[in-house]
Amino acid sequence: MERQPKSLSDAVQLLQTTEIISKCTQTIIAEWSNEAETFKKRASSGRAGAELVLPSHELFNAQRTITAAIGKLIELVSEPSVRILEIAGQYQESRALYIAVERRIPDILASQDNEGGMPVKELSSRTGIEYRKLSRILRYLCSMGTFRQVGPDVFANNTISACLVANEPLRAYVRLTGSEAFTASDRLPKTLLDPSTGPSYDVTRTAWQDAIGTTKPRWEWIEERVEPDKLLDSGYHYPGIPSLILEPQPPGEDGLVARPELEIMGLAMVGGGRVFGAAHVFDFPWASLDNALVVDVGGGVGGFALQLSKVYPDLRFVIQDRGPVIQQALESVWPNENPAALKDQRVQFMEHSFFDKNPVEGADVYYLRYVLHDWSDDYCVNILSHIRESMAPHSRLLICEQVMNTTIGDPDLTSAPAPLPANYGFHARFSHSRDLTMMAAINGIERTPEEFKTILKSAGLALKQIWECRSQVSLLEAVRADARTA
């Protein structure tokens, strides 16, 4: 295949892109310096603030812009056929990370002097993976900048892998995406072409069901108790959680075990929420709401309410979800994370299906985080309609979701500077990856502003504002349509 010559337009874009990188680099270095001073002041005062968990607005904008520019740079300078092969093999990046996280390699490396690193043979004995194979996996991760090689077959954490040390919620997120979600994605090409599942948006007719070998919705399946040998051999495509090979779960008195995916899911929602959810704590004016009642609909174990409760001590919460999830929140999450809120009765827990009218009427805020992306449009209109029935004229609905931009831009969203893709391209990779994960697992959808407006209007609601936060996830504020026009 003959190479194609680059054009003058390519050269102009290359110069523009490198100029953007240069400007962003200066901003980032300046903001790093400001952060160092701020951290010193906070450490001496003992007070926590947004700057301890979030980059400044200037730093965030520079980070996403330079990441988008790096993607544009790769597009411009790569040999096209080489780039195609790179993309084709990128699934191995996530597999390598999943293997390392499953076997707790960041924690093992942190258990001794990180500067000196750990020989791969010692890592092998502690992980159960043959040392030469493990070395190849870690070399791959080091090449990606996820770990650090300090000598021949000697490895250590770097700043990226170190964020996984003693971080069970973030580890759970990697385990979630690397287990059942990955297996579902493997079946997606087949189910897209199937005349039954291809056009369907039913939550029981997805690539996930094809991979698992069940007709149940995912939420029912992960709540099952089964025979221990079923955890690693479902008889279908899904191999289960690998660590169970070396660390099997003991059965209960009934001879059954809980699926580990339920606990992983609960922790993963906390972990993912901490990564992208910190901005929602500080980039929305919660302080102005005083002692408002916030109903977290489908709130899981209450991961976001945990974050809010520690920063805004006057807010009150009702957390609603399925029974087993609420039980997990009451028994193992809140007693450890915020026992004071339980004692002071600032938080209540309620078993509730969001396909029924919300039993809490007239709350100040109804909060939907990562719920609507689980469902196709008809389901979403049903969910939203039942919330609207319970809303008072003063009530507001906050929807915490990815708001999808495209490479050509959207008038409701901020665009990246030219010649970068309007949606910040490389920076938005995770958003688009999660969109396809939703498609494969539950026929869910990550929506554009217009798609959100459509389902809100159908439910008798109106979009008031999109709060673009220091995150890939935004807040959409909606009110009753009749309240907006009153």
UniProtKB/Swiss-Prot annotation:
Broad EC category: transferase
EC number, as in UniProt: 2.1.1.283
Database matches in SUPFAM superfamilies: S-adenosyl-L-methionine-dependent methyltransferases (SSF53335), Winged helix' DNA-binding domain (SSF46785)
PROSITE patterns named among the record's database cross-references: SAM_OMT_II (PS51683)
Gene3D superfamilies reported for this sequence: Vaccinia Virus protein VP39 (3.40.50.150), Winged helix-like DNA-binding domain superfamily/Winged helix DNA-binding domain (1.10.10.10)
Biological process, per Gene Ontology: methylation; secondary metabolite biosynthetic process
Keywords from the named record: Methyltransferase, S-adenosyl-L-methionine, Transferase
Catalysed reaction equations from the record: emodin + S-adenosyl-L-methionine = questin + S-adenosyl-L-homocysteine + H(+)
Pathway this chain belongs to: Secondary metabolite biosynthesis
Residues the record marks as active site: H373 (proton acceptor)
Practical use: Geodin shows the glucose uptake stimulator activity towards rat adipocytes. Geodin also enhances the fibrinolytic activity of vascular endothelial cells.
Chain sites annotated for binding S-adenosyl-L-methionine: G298, G299, D321, S353, F354, R369
InterPro entries in the record: COMT-like, O_MeTrfase_dom, Plant_O-MeTrfase_dimerisation, SAM-dependent_MTases_sf, WH-like_DNA-bd_sf, WH_DNA-bd_sf
pH dependence: Optimum pH is 7.0-8.0.
Top-level division of the source organism's lineage: Eukaryota
GO terms of molecular function: O-methyltransferase activity; protein dimerization activity
Pfam families, per database record: Dimerisation, Methyltransf_2
Role this protein plays: O-methyltransferase; part of the gene cluster that mediates the biosynthesis of geodin, an intermediate in the biosynthesis of other natural products. The pathway begins with the synthesis of atrochrysone thioester by the polyketide synthase (PKS) gedC. The atrochrysone carboxyl ACP thioesterase gedB then breaks the thioester bond and releases the atrochrysone carboxylic acid from gedC. The atrochrysone carboxylic acid is then converted to atrochrysone which is further transformed into emodinanthrone.
Recorded family membership: Belongs to the class I-like SAM-binding methyltransferase superfamily. Cation-independent O-methyltransferase family.
Protein name (database record): O-methyltransferase gedA
